[in-house]
């Protein structure tokens, strides 16, 4: 769009979280499949920090990162679906209602992966999560089974997420990947929105990063 102003929708910290999580999930799958469990555990600890960061960032970050900006009420979701079925799509400043549900589901699956992985024990008791010593062998085995099931659920959710992105591009000519890379969209998509809405606060960023390191330190020292 020639001459348009491009507004910052996704701050750099949120984008870094997003793509780091993508890479970590792929790498952790590979390490688990190939038995590289030392690295699997290390990357799991990084994911602990990332999720702690996301929780704090969802409370104190810019508008589009905050949980309070998410529209997930039945009226918002059903109204959005009706518009899509009618062929009406207006880009949202942040997550649209369906995108919000997708993010919540994926984050929940990631938390389930991390939570069970920390306590999981393999069938021979040779490999285990960093907190496995805090629970019985039977509980560790149950955690391992849930860990595997929840990963399959996570893969299904990621598949649906990617399929939705492709559908938006195909049916509505709306590229949702580019803004998650550059952070910006044309301001004309949103109307009158303050350009400062998605900018970083370095103090708040420092607090969120500190929370991430605190979570990693706490987990690594709890076992």
Question: Which residues make up each language-model segment?
Answer:
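Membrane-embedded alpha-helical bundles that constitute the cytochrome b-like, heme-associated redox core
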Residues: 1-223
């Amino acid at each position: 769009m020639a001459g348009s102003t491009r507004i910052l929708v996704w701050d750099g910290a949120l984008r870094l979280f997003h793509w780091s999580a993508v890479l970590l999930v792929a790498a952790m799958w590979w390490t688990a499949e190939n038995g590289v469990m030392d690295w699997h555990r290390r990357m799991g600890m990084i994911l602990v920090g990332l999720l702690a960061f996301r929780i704090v960032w969802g409370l104190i970050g810019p508008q589009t990162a905050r949980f309070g900006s998410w529209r997930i009420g039945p009226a918002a979701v059903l109204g959005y679906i009706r518009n899509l079925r009618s062929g009406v799509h207006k880009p949202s400043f942040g997550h649209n209602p369906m995108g919000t549900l997708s993010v919540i589901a994926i984050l929940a699956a990631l938390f389930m992966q991390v939570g069970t992985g920390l306590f999981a024990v393999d069938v021979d008791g040779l490999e285990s999560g960093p907190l496995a010593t805090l629970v019985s062998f039977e509980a560790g085995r149950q955690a391992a089974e849930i860990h595997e099931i929840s990963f399959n659920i996570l893969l299904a959710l990621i598949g649906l997420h990617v399929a939705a992105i492709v559908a938006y591009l195909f049916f509505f000519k709306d590229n949702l990947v580019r803004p998650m890379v550059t952070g910006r969209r044309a301001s004309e998509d949103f109307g009158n929105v303050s350009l400062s809405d998605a900018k970083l606060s370095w103090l708040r960023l420092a607090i969120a990063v500190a929370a991430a390191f605190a979570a990693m330190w706490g987990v690594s020292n709890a076992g």
